[in-house]
């Protein structure tokens, strides 16, 4: 008999809401557990089945920890500023605030339908002035510390979006992550955050957190620490010079040309008249490319000769100076010494332009291919014969002694481009005065509320639409000095860089959060979300947290103690013979195969990311309606390891529902007795032990497997002790909370399973109390019998003879060999 999931789930969701069951515990005598989801951007599309995977994981842990006696903070909120809402508003003429509010209501409805145990009294919304007052407050603190500053920088400008975007938001093909629009480089006045001031700490403190090694490595690579030397090169025949940063000063003898970034200040001054036109044209083309496109290793190398030469400081040789876009103005000093024998990009460039390739490390044929392995130095005078480490040390000594270079540490990490030329974001709380000074708003002037307007199209001047709102824009100080508010707004990353702190004290109007509460709840114990946020969000949040730590606002160096990245739930999709993906509505199934409806071509089934274009997005509303929220939760946790990417399967969903139906039948149909005959002792105690251990490890799929093993065992047993029925329902509750609440009451318990103490297991019951032995006559198997474990030899012999009494009739027993817990062999004549 199937249970009515719609009725049961609605009933218990109402019970939890009415009773405020999941209000955060405040008992100071209990340990704390802070389970955090990466809060969603509330898009118009609503949730898809990928969202609940991570949310279910944190919900299971939260329910488990409540039952273990923890105060649990499990909140949810909305990352609601940003480009998508504004783009939608511009396309449709709707107000982004209204659109966002509708989307949030829909997301909240969907989330509640899945039975997640969020404390909704903690809900935050990044677009709420009571929230972004503190985002702005953090900005003013960054400004006071010199960590927020204005600079004229070449930005990634996207004409279609009317805004500049960060390097991290530019795709490898040179288009924008949002919308796939062309990105061009354009100098503009921008707000920058000095994340580089924290580079070393961001690197070092990765050792203190329990994060996937792959994510740590991505952050290390993004920060990109390099130890090397700054080397000064003079320009031949002039009084000019430039600096180069190199991680390999030991290869200076192999430097045969120099390359300047197209934006380098020296280019105009040193380019000869004959080369001016070619260099100017090259620089123009380079200005249209993004940094990512320029540094793409696979692209063909291009450049222009300046006509000038540098002097190699280690041997006095002249080296031609080129301009090439594979060198970025923002890295090192915007100049490189090219060692084509031992650097792939330099080698490719040298091959294109016929430049000298001089090996200085032994091994390989550098005319045929670049040699990047280690080896003894050659062609390097006083460095000859030394290995890499020795040669680097000696080269730096030489440079410092001659005052032509010095040891240097650099980072790939660039300062964070923080301003956006858009409307739908937090206003930056700065006023620019007509006397050329700028001031930040004081705390009592915050929040600086985003003004309501129907005109949110980009201004076209490079400023945001706020530049059009003169009533809001123009201010006059008490002494009559006139000023203009900052018109740029903050990027979407701003609110998400600190939102986890506001959950701790969401209604505080006097401070970002109460220091005592921050001390009580930080750091976050488990943070679950997608690996796509490895660099941006996680790095920015760590940076802001460290600034707040330095200000004495937060008590911990790191925000998130443990990070877990759930895998992706893939959709069903199909490929044709060319490997092209075919939308599901163009596919028909017949004769056990899949065919293109229009062409009749046989297609291959292949999992792919769910997308609207492939029409393979599964809406959780449909799953909840047909199968129930508990089924969806159990299925998504049973699909495989939580961090694996696995294709969605309707059959798997049906399997999860069948398991829940069997669990219900087990409770409803078993003979449940107060007394215990011991028959299920071992499997029950194993189940409690295994489920508990696997929850601690987040091995949710194998925890569910163990629950299935228990159900199978009960179906073969004569009776189910009430204690074990209750215990099973408690173990099921984190995974399938609605049906567990229902079964809990059916077993005669008071409503409300959430805070009932988690079951414990008896170690002694994990040991088999019975063993199966074989009984042989003259070495031939005659019977298998179950007996009490560790019986004395005499007792064993007696039971063995009795079990084969018929076969022994008329025979003369010579001797009986009994091996405890194994066998009885009766020798007869």
Curated annotation (Swiss-Prot):
Question: From what organism does this protein derive?
Answer: Lactococcus lactis subsp. lactis (strain IL1403) (Streptococcus lactis)
* Sequence motif 'KMSKS' region, residues: 609-613
Catalyses which reaction(s): tRNA(Leu) + L-leucine + ATP = L-leucyl-tRNA(Leu) + AMP + diphosphate
Please give the name of this protein. Leucine--tRNA ligase
The EC number on file is 6.1.1.4
Any idea which positions bind ATP?
A: 612
Q: Which PROSITE patterns match?
A: AA_TRNA_LIGASE_I
Where's the motif 'HIGH' region? 40-51
Q: What are the record's GO terms for cellular component?
A: cytosol
According to its UniProt record, where is this protein located?
Cytoplasm
Please state which protein family the record places this protein in: Belongs to the class-I aminoacyl-tRNA synthetase family.
Example of a GO MF term: leucine-tRNA ligase activity
